[in-house]
Regions:
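Conserved catalytic core of the tyrosine transesterase superfamily
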Residues: 1-267
Length: 267
């Protein structure tokens, strides 16, 4: 049945990693709890709540619920846990640190990584989306991405980045195809980017907690709102289904909150 479930998911618009996660979850549940019934499902939920963060718990429960839908057992579906939203953004690279990292990468001749960081912070691209950028997209100034629901999201490449990236591509003789490649000439992986970011954070004495791929997407959103306060437009640029998701960028980071309190509160 799990194999049939996997084949069913593969025909949907779910990302490959999501399919893998759902199948792994169902297999784990069946191996450890056996029969699918309310008692076992609640026991599994209890195990998740005790051992994982709410977001992870809900991801696992989503996989279980998808399986219950597939096996026509919707009545057994498990409720998600409530995720307490923090009133500040966590682990977002500061604008100063972003500029510092860019400058160091440029000075040390890490041109490809200089552009990886710049592209992420200047386009708001997810790391998986970044890998789809080709030389042809630099020429036209944008990349069209297709979301799970079949919607098109346009990733715009700002003029100053286009100009410098085009110059770099001419220097390395790359006229077409994917621009971010590993030493074997193959597309770099998301894991490779994450690993290299950790290396650079250590090399330049930066906080590893803020030097990770999604941090630069957060920085794009924060910088955009600081300079052009249009939440609806930002939601479109980020590819958010709901503007409520984008509202988090109206919040300050924890360090920003601390600085404001230190400056304002003198009584």
């Amino acid at each position: 049945m799990v194999t049939k479930f996997k084949n069913h998911l593969a025909k949907t618009n779910l990302a490959k990693n999501t399919v893998t996660s759902y199948v792994w979850t169902v297999q784990y549940f069946l191996n450890h709890y056996g029969e699918v019934n309310k008692k076992n499902l609640l026991a599994y939920k209890g195990y998740l709540v005790e051992n994982f963060k709410p977001q992870t718990v809900n991801l696992r429960l989503q996989g279980i619920n998808k399986y219950l839908e597939f096996t026509k057992q919707e009545k057994l579906k498990v409720k998600f846990v409530k995720v307490q939203q923090k009133n500040f953004l966590e682990n977002v690279i500061s604008d100063a640190d972003y500029k510092f990292l860019k400058a160091q990468l440029k000075a040390d001749g890490y041109d490809e990584w200089y552009f990886i960081v710049w592209f992420m912070a200047a386009t708001g691209a997810r790391v998986s989306e970044l890998l789809h950028i080709k030389a042809e997209h630099i020429q036209i100034g944008h990349l069209d991405l297709y979301s799970k629901g079949g919607k098109i999201r346009r990733l715009y490449i700002p003029k100053n980045l286009r100009t410098e990236a085009a110059k770099w591509l001419r220097e390395i003789g790359l006229t077409s195809g994917y621009i971010f490649l590993n030493r074997f000439g193959q597309r770099i992986t998301t894991r490779g980017i994450t690993s290299q970011f950790k290396h650079f954070a250590e090399k330049y004495g930066m906080n590893k907690e803020v030097v990770y791929p999604h941090s630069f997407r957060h920085r794009f959103a924060k910088n955009f709102l600081d300079r052009f306060n249009d939440l609806a437009l930002l939601a479109d640029l980020m590819g958010h289904e709901s503007i409520e998701t984008t509202r988090i960028y109206l919040r300050r980071t924890a360090s920003e909150q601390q600085k404001i309190v230190d400056k304002v509160v003198n009584w």
